[in-house]
Amino acid sequence: MVKRVNLALQGGGAHGAFTWGVLDRMLEDDSLEIAAITGTSAGALNGAAFKAGMARDGRTGAKQALDTLWAQMGAVGDLRMANWIAGFDAGPLLNVLKMAAPFSPLEAVSQAISPYSYGPFYRNPLRQVVDRFDFDEVCADTGPELYICATSVQTGKVRVFSGTDISTDAILASACLPNIFQAIEIPDPETGARDAYWDGGYTGNPALFPLFRHDLPDDLIVVNINPLVREDVPKTAHDIQNRVNEISFNSSLLRELRAISFVQRLLAEGTVERGRMKRALVHMI
């Protein structure tokens, strides 16, 4: 018997490689079918690769697409990627550096220099990876539904891209940390005005609400790569900023999980008539 589930893929730089491993294992289980994916930042990249591969050659294609994605990510030779690739933790190299100084040199540079200071020489190093996606496959009707989350700079609200609205710029917007990359401008579908977007993690890491349709499965698996709990209180400037980032990028997810819990309680108590609101069974990896 095939079990249909939805996936919610968090962002977190190279920690997204953990999600790659989770997806690779799921693809080996023929009893599991992915109905829909919502993703932010690295989760958006993983989701796009998964969807494109499934559209091209089913489970085998998805495995190959994920392998290719992370091979390309590892080959990006740009110092600005150091902070993004490391996610919210500085990683082994920067951990060595921070022992010799109260701050990370690369982090200090990224905080002091605006991405707009590069002038005409600016290039987003992620574009060379995202441009290689076949968007006929990413936006195909076959395979799981895909939702990509980004944050509007002007309104501070989440925008969810789906269907043919998913593009190179939509994925770059979802992964746009503003101290590293220039905001990504995308036309508003209603007004035509070009709106600026930053990383989706600020408002939806990832957004869960696109999955609350009655035609989608009740089961939702959240692949969590940002620690919800840390036992130790951070003391160094780096560790403090690291924890602030973790809390900030988890806050939107926690709000939605609390809302889900509230609705499920109302359904269980009979306060809300069954069928009027979505039943949700949330699992976390």
Regions found by a protein language model. Give the residues of each.
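Gly/Ala-rich beta-loop-alpha elbow adjacent to hydrolase catalytic centers
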Residues: 39, 43
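Patatin-like phospholipase
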Residues: 1-38, 48-285
